[in-house]
């Protein structure tokens, strides 16, 4: 819902205004009602005594808008959709009006009005709550200074020219309000207008359109007329007004009766257009609330929802059609389905548009087939006059109430001025390549493009303010208008339609336009290369204009591109040109693989790009004939540097924890940027680095498929854009969208695109990984078909697929059994455009699939700009919202590597790890006090450890005093041929009893592995839990995380609270360490030592047994209890645990009943037994410093050393006690826990 409060001032008294407005309403009703397709029916006009405002006049009217809707559209819609109902309660000086449509249930306009004798200074006339006051927008209408549309202007209705003969008033000057406030009379109409159109995809656009055109423009002209007609009403009384109203009602009834009995010719040959207030004039006969009525014929809210028929709606007359199959019944079925989709889901979950989203002025064109985002402007208003009025988005005049938010124009200037000398407040710049959808028939107007950007900006601001406050004021948006390359192709294809001769035919609205052919024809044109060069030039101009603006002074942040349906195609080829021309480190041979001949396959000779080598691909130069005839106008390419509304302006916070990946994704540009070139050239490129490229429903996949068809030897991966990552966002029902991933790896056609989480449910994401490596690992069976996969029978091995073969059972998995098995995975990683998935599917109502295909591109194109799902997704990719966490050690710490990045020791390393993510891990180490302390880790890259880090330096850091959060560098090791390293802690630096976070940082790229070093006393008691055997309530091979058994966390916490060391064991391979620890953290399991199998093995139970044996024999732990599955009974028996110490979860097995205790009643009943004291015993020995307790998921204090009597049970004297008096073990004073963050160089 969009709420605006209008203040309308007039130099007259309240009594005069009441007569003036009522006279104006009845007069306009007479003049502008022409019949059934354009007219008003007055159903009721009677007084009331107990209603809104007390006693007053009630009116009920029906507006007929059929003549203002295209003929093919009228044929589809039932009659009920061509009517708008108005109910009005007039208790002057208070009035209330409500507009509804019987066909669109979730559409409404509510208007409340107070008429007061003041100058509009009262801040809260309607007693709004704090939330409503923050949401509303104030807008003052000036009948003199605000311009009207050119088609509505009349000199006799201009207050600057009008002079009343009878009263002597006028003409009015520009400062008339100040003069009237001093001399009087002066009155103000306070109008609170609430517009709601809660249907998917178009909510913000339609609500803003109704406000700007349907309400403001109508009210402005109506009040100008009320002033300029005063010679006609000044001598009338209220009795005269009531008589005129009755006469008008009879006349309108006769006129409508004639139309109902006459022919239907009015639809085929509609009468002359009445003026804009045709319906508003008759909207309130007997009611001074008339000017808020729906807008005029060509700019009306009813026309807007008529044209926006693809938004959900429901016909109240659907039963009339029965079972007959007709255009009307078909349309009703579609509307009912999409409306039902809206009703079955809560409003918080279904609608992408949010309260307070705003847009600039826009008007729908006349035909759905010509309806596009470039034409949402007033058909009568010129751009110059639209800019001159404060109403089309002039926030400086409308500011948000109560000073909660200053006008954006002044806010941007002030903020930039304050920061100019220090640092740029903007950390992320989005350049929006806006060309429209493939059905746009022309370039449209710049204001309509700006309106889409403003809608997106409002969505950014709303989402950022609620869920990403650290980014508020640090994100800017800039518009880059792009040529409408599909316009000529659309005009050509439209003329080829079998129904092109019949412009009003119903069949023309059906799917006779081959949408897929439009981008293919457009990109095959000889003019396409010139369009790409134009986009490059305009993008550079927009970027340089931002740098020259106060807001962008000193900008060194990351730059991302956003491309709509057609703009995405142009942006992709612009990035390919940039890669070909070379942009710093991006100008490598692997990226320079796009030539100009590929942009237009029909242009120039077709040849094999691989025959000439990769360098040969960049030799082509654009044809001079493709050059634009003149230079690009600067006003079209560069937005205003000041006062622009397409950036999210906010006063920067004094301290901000948000630092995007600035150093790695962008560079500080020079003050001056190259101007737009006159035409494309071999060196045409973007002047900045691009971190990410977001596509909004772009048919780029079809274009790339065509190029591969024309040049079979060309691989899509060769056309590598000069950006770090591409995000292809689309709706599944969008006929224009296409996937990109199957072009890079054909087997991805069997993998569904990732689903973008709904913002209302998961504003910060649902936790799903976007990394390509994780997808390859999850679907490893598709890419490693040569290996025989089997699922182990042991419950502890439910982690994933294990490979069968003797070589894998003995050799480290760093050396695969067959090199060919991972070659395809490596090939995919090398060819991919980034490190994340590319295709992302957005939510849309299923009922949209039933609509004519030709209407969907317009709807989907408009939906992206207001989608909170899209905005939240983009922000999550740009912002490091969640810092890397030390899952094994509770809390991260402030950390900056002591050694800067160095060149790799081996030249091949840089090539091997390109486009693959790190998968380093280090094993948790448990050491008995006084024994050698040895740390081990393994450094791998890619899914399934396809790349090994060999012969590279790794720095080892240990947090010796966890309370301080300070990392100490202990030494440097070099990885071996298997990517492993072993680091013995020097004896002179051996650590005392406690838990110490460890980090092993790769010197070359500062990726790292984490673990914990646990030093315990001899005889420390421990409890062992098998993760898959005792915790999981469901089986998960490689997919979603398994469920946790009820009460499992409480049982583990009980043992920890009793002072026992917790040991977790699992048969999963160590490559899954991060996922398993994240699962433990998600369910708030207490902290403990976690053990994994060393790589892939066919006998995970044997490795678990060996690990536990080492704890008993080498660490001298005393294991007092073990939990697991029936498979673990033999493992625990080998450790010497008695049946009373072995707990098996699940159904009892008869042959094992004598070897263990089955917890058939679950953990809850077992916990009751534990708490009853049946398994507790008093600690022996004196209290001493021991291990601290904490939880994975709960931030606990990091004082890891506490008194043993409270935390850990140990038997026997410690080493310090054996050696006699001396230096006591290191202890830390209790202190306040720190909330610490992690900051790596690679993330700055």
Curated annotation (Swiss-Prot):
Swiss-Prot/TrEMBL keywords: Calcium, Cytoplasm, Endoplasmic reticulum, Golgi apparatus, Lipid droplet, Membrane, Metal-binding, Methylation, Phosphoprotein, Protein transport, Transport
Question: Residue positions of the PTM Omega-N-methylarginine?
Answer: 1211, 1218
Which residues get modified to Phosphoserine? 300, 304, 319, 326, 329, 342, 345-346, 373, 382, 593, 600, 621, 896, 1237
The biological processes this protein is annotated with in GO are: brain development; lipid metabolic process; phosphatidylinositol biosynthetic process; phospholipid transport; phototransduction; protein transport
A Pfam family the protein falls into: IP_trans
Q: What is the effect of changing residue 382 to A?
A: Strongly reduced phosphorylation
Q: In which tissues is it expressed?
A: Ubiquitous.
Q: What is the recorded function of this protein according to its Swiss-Prot or TrEMBL entry?
A: Catalyzes the transfer of phosphatidylinositol (PI) between membranes. Binds PI, phosphatidylcholine (PC) and phosphatidic acid (PA) with the binding affinity order of PI > PA > PC. Regulates RHOA activity, and plays a role in cytoskeleton remodeling. Necessary for normal completion of cytokinesis. Plays a role in maintaining normal diacylglycerol levels in the Golgi apparatus. Necessary for maintaining the normal structure of the endoplasmic reticulum and the Golgi apparatus. Required for protein export from the endoplasmic reticulum and the Golgi. Binds calcium ions.
Question: Under which name does UniProt file this protein?
Answer: Membrane-associated phosphatidylinositol transfer protein 1
Record organism: Homo sapiens
Q: Which gene encodes it?
A: PITPNM1
């Amino acid at each position: 819902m969009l709420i605006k409060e209008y203040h309308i001032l007039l130099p007259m008294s309240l009594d005069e205004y009441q007569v003036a407005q009522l006279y104006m309403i009845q007069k306009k009703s007479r003049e502008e009602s022409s019949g059934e397709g354009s007219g008003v029916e007055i159903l009721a006009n009677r007084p009331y005594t107990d209603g809104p405002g007390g006693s007053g006049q009630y009116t009920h009217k029906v507006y007929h808008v059929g003549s203002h809707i295209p003929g093919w559209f009228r044929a589809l819609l039932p009659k009920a959709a061509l009517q708008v109902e108005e109910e009005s309660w007039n208790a002057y000086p208070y009035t209330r009006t409500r507009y509804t449509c019987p066909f669109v249930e979730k559409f409404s306009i509510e208007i409340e009005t107070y008429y007061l004798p003041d100058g509009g200074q009262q801040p809260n006339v309607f007693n709004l709550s704090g939330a409503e006051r923050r949401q509303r927008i104030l807008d003052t209408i000036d009948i003199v200074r605000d311009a009207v549309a050119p088609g509505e202007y009349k000199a006799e209705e201009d207050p600057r020219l009008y002079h009343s003969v009878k009263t002597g008033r006028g003409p009015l000057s520009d400062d008339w309000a100040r003069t009237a406030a001093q001399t009087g009379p002066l009155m103000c109409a306070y109008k609170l207008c609430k517009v709601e159109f809660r249907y998917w995809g178009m909510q913000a656009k339609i609500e803003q359109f109704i406000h700007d055109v349907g309400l403001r423009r109508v009210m402005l002209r109506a009040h100008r007329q009320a002033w300029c007609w005063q010679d006609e009403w000044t001598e009338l009384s209220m009795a005269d007004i009531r008589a005129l109203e009755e006469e008008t009602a009879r006349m309108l009834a006769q006129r409508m009766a004639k139309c109902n009995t006459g022919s239907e010719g009015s639809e085929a040959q509609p009468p002359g257009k009445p003026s804009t207030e045709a319906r508003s004039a008759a909207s309130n006969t007997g009611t001074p609330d008339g000017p808020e009525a729906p807008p005029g014929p060509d700019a009306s809210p009813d026309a807007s929802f008529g044209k926006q028929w693809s938004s959900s709606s429901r016909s109240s007359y659907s039963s009339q059609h029965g079972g007959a199959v007709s255009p009307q019944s078909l349309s009703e079925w579609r509307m009912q389905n999409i409306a039902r989709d809206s009703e079955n889901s809560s409003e918080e979950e279904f609608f992408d548009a949010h309260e307070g989203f705003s847009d600039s002025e826009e008007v729908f064109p006349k035909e759905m087939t010509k309806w596009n985002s470039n034409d949402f402007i007033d058909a009568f208003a010129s751009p110059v006059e639209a800019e001159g009025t404060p109403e089309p988005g002039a926030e400086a005049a409308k500011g948000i109430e109560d000073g909660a938010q200053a006008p954006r124009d002044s806010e941007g200037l002030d903020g930039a001025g304050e920061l100019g000398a220090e640092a740029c407040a903007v950390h992320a710049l989005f350049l929006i390549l806006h060309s429209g959808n493939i059905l746009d028939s022309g370039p449209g107007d710049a204001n309509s493009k700006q309106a889409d950007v403003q809608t997106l900006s409002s969505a950014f601001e709303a989402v950022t303010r609620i869920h990403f406050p650290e980014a508020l004021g640090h994100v800017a948006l800039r518009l880059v208008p792009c040529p409408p390359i599909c316009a000529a192709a659309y005009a050509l294809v439209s003329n080829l339609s079998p129904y092109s001769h019949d412009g009003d035919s119903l069949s023309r609205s059906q799917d006779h336009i081959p949408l897929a052919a439009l981008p293919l024809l457009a990109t095959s044109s000889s003019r396409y290369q010139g369009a790409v060069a134009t986009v490059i030039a305009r993008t550079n101009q927009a970027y340089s204009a931002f740098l020259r603006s106060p807001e962008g002074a000193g900008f060194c942040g990351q730059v991302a591109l956003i491309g709509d349906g057609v703009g995405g195609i142009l942006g992709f080829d612009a990035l390919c040109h940039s890669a070909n021309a070379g942009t710093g480190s991006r100008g490598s041979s692997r990226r320079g693989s796009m030539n100009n001949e590929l942009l237009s396959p029909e242009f120039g000779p077709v040849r094999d790009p691989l025959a000439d080598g990769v360098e040969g691909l960049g030799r082509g130069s654009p044809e001079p004939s493709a050059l634009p005839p003149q230079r690009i106008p600067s006003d079209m390419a560069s937005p205003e540097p000041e006062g622009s509304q397409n950036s999210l302006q906010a006063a920067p916070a004094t301290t901000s924890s948000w630092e995007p990946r600035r150093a790695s994704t962008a560079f500080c540009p020079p003050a001056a940027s190259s101007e737009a070139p006159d035409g494309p050239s071999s060196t045409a490129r973007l002047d900045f680095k691009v971190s990410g490229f977001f596509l909004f429903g772009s048919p780029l996949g079809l274009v790339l498929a065509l190029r591969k068809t024309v040049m079979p030897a060309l691989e899509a991966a060769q056309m590598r854009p000069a950006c770090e990552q591409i995000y292809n966002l689309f709706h599944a029902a969008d006929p224009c969208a296409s996937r990109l991933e199957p072009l890079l790896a054909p087997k991805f056609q069997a993998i569904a695109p990732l689903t973008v989480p709904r913002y209302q449910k998961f504003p910060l994401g649902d936790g799903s990984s976007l990394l390509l490596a994780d997808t390859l690992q999850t679907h490893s069976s598709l890419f490693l078909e040569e290996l025989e996969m089997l699922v182990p029978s042991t419950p502890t091995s439910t982690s994933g697929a294990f490979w069968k073969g003797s070589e894998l059972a003995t050799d480290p998995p760093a050396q695969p059994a067959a090199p060919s098995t991972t070659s395809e995975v490596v090939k995919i990683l090398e060819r991919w455009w980034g490190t994340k998935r590319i295709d992302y599917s957005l939510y849309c109502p299923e009922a949209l699939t039933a609509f004519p295909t030709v209407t969907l591109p317009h709807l989907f194109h408009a939906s992206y700009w207001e989608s909170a799902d899209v905005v939240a997704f983009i922000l999550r990719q740009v912002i490091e919202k969640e810092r890397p966490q030390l899952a094994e050690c509770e809390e991260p710490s402030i950390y900056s590597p002591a050694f800067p990045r160095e060149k790799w020791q081996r030249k091949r390393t840089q090539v091997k790890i390109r486009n693959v993510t790190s998968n380093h891990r280090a094993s948790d180490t448990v050491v008995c006090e006084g024994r050698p302390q040895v740390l081990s880790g393994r450094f791998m890259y890619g899914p399934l450890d396809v790349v090994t880090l060999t012969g590279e330096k790794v720095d080892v850091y240990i947090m010796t005093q966890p309370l301080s959060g300070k990392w100490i560098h202990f030494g440097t090791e070099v990885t071996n041929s298997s990517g492993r390293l072993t680091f013995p802690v020097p004896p002179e630096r051996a650590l005392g009893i406690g838990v110490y976070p460890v980090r092993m940082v790769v010197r070359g790229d500062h990726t790292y592995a984490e673990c914990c070093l646990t030093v315990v006393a001899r005889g420390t008691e421990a409890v062992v839990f098998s993760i898959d055997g005792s915790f999981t309530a469901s089986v998960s091979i490689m997919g979603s995380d398994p469920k946790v058994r009820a009460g499992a966390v409480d049982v583990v916490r009980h043992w920890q609270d009793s002072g026992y060391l917790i040991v977790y064991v699992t048969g999963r391979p160590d490559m899954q360490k991060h996922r398993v620890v994240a699962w433990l953290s998600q369910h708030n399991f207490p902290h403990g030592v976690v053990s994994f199998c060393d790589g892939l093995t066919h006998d995970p139970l044997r490795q678990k047994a060996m690990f536990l044996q080492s704890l008993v024999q080498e660490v001298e732990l005393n294991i007092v209890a073990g939990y697991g599955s029936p498979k673990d009974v033999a493992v625990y028996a080998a450790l010497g645990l008695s049946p009373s110490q072995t707990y098996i979860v699940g159904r009892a097995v008869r042959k094992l009943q004598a070897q263990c205790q089955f917890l058939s009643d679950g953990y809850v009943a077992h916990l009751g037994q534990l708490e009853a004291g049946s398994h507790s015993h008093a600690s022996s020995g004196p209290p001493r410093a021991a291990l601290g307790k904490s939880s994975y998921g709960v931030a606990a204090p990091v004082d890891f050393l506490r008194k043993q009597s409270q935390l850990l049970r140990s038997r026997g004297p410690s080493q310090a006690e054996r050696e006699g008096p001396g230096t006591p073990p290191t202890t830390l004073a209790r202190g306040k826990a720190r909330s610490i963050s992690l900051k790596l160089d690679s993330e700055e």
